[in-house]
Amino acid sequence: MSKRNSTKNDIKLSDVGVAQWMDYQIILQEWKIGKLSSEIKNSIVKDMSSLSEFRGQSINANELESMIGDWSIYPITNKFKIIALWKIIENHRNKHNLGYILKSNVLEKTNKSKQNNNGFNGHKGNFSENEIRKTNNYRIIKKQKIEFEKNNKNTIITRKNNNNNNSNNNNNNNNNYNQKSNTTMDNNYSDDDYQNEQNEFEEEDYDSNDDENDSHDENENFNIIKPKTTNQLKRKVSSSFTNNNYHVNNNNNNNDNINNFNSNSNSNTSNNNNNNNSDNNINNNNNNNNNNNNNNNNNNNNNNNNNNNNNNINNNYINNNNNDSWNNQFQNQLMYCNNYQAQYQQLHPNHYQLQYQQQQQNINNNINANNNNNNNNNNNNNNNLNDSTPNNQTNNDLKSSNHSNYDFNYNTNERLSHSPIQTHSSSNNSTPSNQSPTFPSNYISQNANINYNPNQGSMFYPPQQFYVESMFYQQQLQQQQQQQQQIAQQPVSQQNNNVETNQDNVQQQ
């Protein structure tokens, strides 16, 4: 291959297309890096090892070409490695005058000696002078690049449709979803409107700086799949709010509580009837769970008070049922709780039976502890039964711990006993213990601002509770580390005494 003038025929940074890092991968695959001398390749490897993109990776100078080929399989994941290697090789090309390491079939040659009948230059194919020839590797990477840009636009359109149609879906799904499956949820929004929006995004210029300055994970763009039609998208969104079966696999018969939520959201013409039905569904668990032979009179009074509290809670929820943000939050929490519950049930199949028993005990304890408060508020709650507007009494009921079908602190210590984190008792200084720490009953109410609807069922774990428990574990571990540092600063003789006392404490426990 004859040498070509590097200043004329070589590929420059300004020649790179829209998504620069994708073109970097194309050019890296076409360079004959394996033909370089061992000294230059070792220098490239040395520069790569000094960068954070290649930290912890063993790089062989003789395997640079194969490594670049592996990057083409997952170009999005290796985006920053591709950019870093491009810059390193550019520096070495300028330093060592490596203007001829391109393969012979990369640059398109112009045959100016051959002319046609019209006096113009000979046919050059579909490529202008000094452009990259469409080799096999180029076609593969170019296809990935086009799909990347297309997915970016589809992701933006999908997110925009979700935001614009949430209110329409939530207002119309109760009346339209029970009709034919192909019925459009919103007649004002057609497939033609969707196509017009897509054309508007295609006309906009794609900013290449968004790829380089984007600090988020690029893989999240490929995890979002756009539905085929707008109707399919709307049915998908509405089904999560109107379907009467959430496929919650548990052993505690929470279908009554879940159907209570559905009955409230699926009634637009007979709210009073549905309110009575939902109250009956909620209070069935109360009547079934509070069969205590020793406290029949107290339980009857408490059940009446709980009925009034539940009426206030349901009235408050019905008035705020059109809150789109709350619906979206509930959907996310429901998915999170279902996934966690399914995984936890596989690890601890017998845990839910213990949890159910502990829940019943906590319910009875709360009833006995709040007898006086419920008796004093009985008259106020009865006055609020026919009032559908939220008031101060409703807010107090939401904050009260006397909800027999959802106890926030139920079985917390038993669940913590399964945790893999080994904590230390705070009563003995730096004494290890095999028992789980006692979780304070008022810890959550003091350290978390929780806005959670109790009608969602007793088996739904709120994500806020896991956050608070993790903070509790973190405090325990910090106390342990501080105690160990204090022991390390003491003299050796005193450390031995502390170790002996710690061992005695362990034996006593």
Curated annotation (Swiss-Prot):
Transmembrane segments: none annotated. Residues 112-131, 152-325, 365-457, 488-509 are annotated as: Disordered. Disulfide bonds: none annotated. Residues 228-242, 398-422, 443-457, 496-509 have a biased composition (Polar residues). It comes from the Eukaryota. Residues 189-217 have a biased composition (Acidic residues). Residues 116-127, 153-184, 243-325, 365-397, 423-442 have a biased composition (Low complexity). This is Putative uncharacterized protein DDB_G0267716. It comes from Dictyostelium discoideum.
